[in-house]
């Protein structure tokens, strides 16, 4: 599998499960991404605290779909502000074996975004953004983000890794307009 295909695999997995075609993405250089997306996405920080700081509130998780197979846990999610407004649509593949059992349990409960769970439980980790992209939202993405008509959306493919370089999760993150 090519690195690019691997970066998007958490996202593409849900389309494959639904036997649907994923929208075409266009890779872009981080510096060419327009603001405020560049400040939010082109960073080595976790999205959860970055978005919480930007929106001045704690975000909560809405799980739209999940697949748990052994040590791999995939979920399609929204991060919502307190008024239930979506601030991120994402797909994530979590490697449960990289986490302690108590943290695994919190992740599987699906109450908090992964970044929040890692920070709140003092799990040392870092982000490694792999790709930045634009996409014209399809029905699935637009419905999830509350977008009424197709428009250009921006996102990133990111890997969360332990301090020892072991992957915790691969994430595809898309922000609303």
Model-identified regions with their sequence ranges:
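Composition-driven recognition of glycine/serine/threonine/acidic- and proline-rich low-complexity segments
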Residues: 1-177
């Amino acid at each position: 599998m090519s690195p690019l295909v691997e970066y998007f695999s958490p996202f593409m997995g849900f389309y494959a499960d639904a036997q649907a075609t994923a929208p075409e993405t266009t890779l872009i250089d981080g510096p060419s991404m327009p603001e405020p997306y560049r400040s939010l996405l082109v960073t080595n920080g976790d999205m959860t605290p970055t978005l919480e700081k930007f929106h001045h509130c704690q975000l909560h998780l809405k799980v739209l779909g999940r697949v748990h197979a052994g040590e791999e846990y995939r979920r399609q999610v929204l991060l919502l502000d307190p008024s239930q407004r979506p601030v991120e649509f994402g797909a994530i593949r979590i490697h449960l074996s990289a986490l302690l059992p108590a943290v695994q349990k919190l992740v599987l409960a699906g109450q908090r975004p992964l970044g929040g769970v890692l920070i709140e439980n003092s799990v040392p980790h870092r982000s490694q953004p792999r790709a930045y992209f634009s996409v014209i939202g399809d029905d699935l993405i637009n419905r999830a983000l509350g977008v009424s008509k197709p428009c250009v959306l921006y996102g990133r493919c990111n890997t969360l890794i332990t301090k020892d370089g072991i992957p915790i999760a691969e994430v595809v993150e898309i922000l609303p307009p």
